[in-house]
Amino acid sequence: MPSSFDPKKDAANLRKHGVSLVEGDGVLNNLLLLTIEDTASEGEQRFVSIGMNVFGQLRVVVYTLRGDDARIISVRKPEPKEVRAYEEGV
């Protein structure tokens, strides 16, 4: 799935989480991916996916759909409970 993100948001995400939004593209294009709808988001429909980036590192990606593209909102390292959920789910 093609993806896009705001360069300013990328800089903010890098400062906050130490991870670039660029990594989200690799996660969303990985076949071993767990995705749920983020029911806590208000306004637009958002999804949370966990999977491996192109470097083989587990990442959590928050995104919304804009047409045929995934608009990446956030990428971060997973919490221990998210790692377990991924390992049990795939």
Please place each PLM-identified region on the residue numbering:
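Ribonuclease/tRNase effector modules and their secretory precursors
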Residues: M1-V90
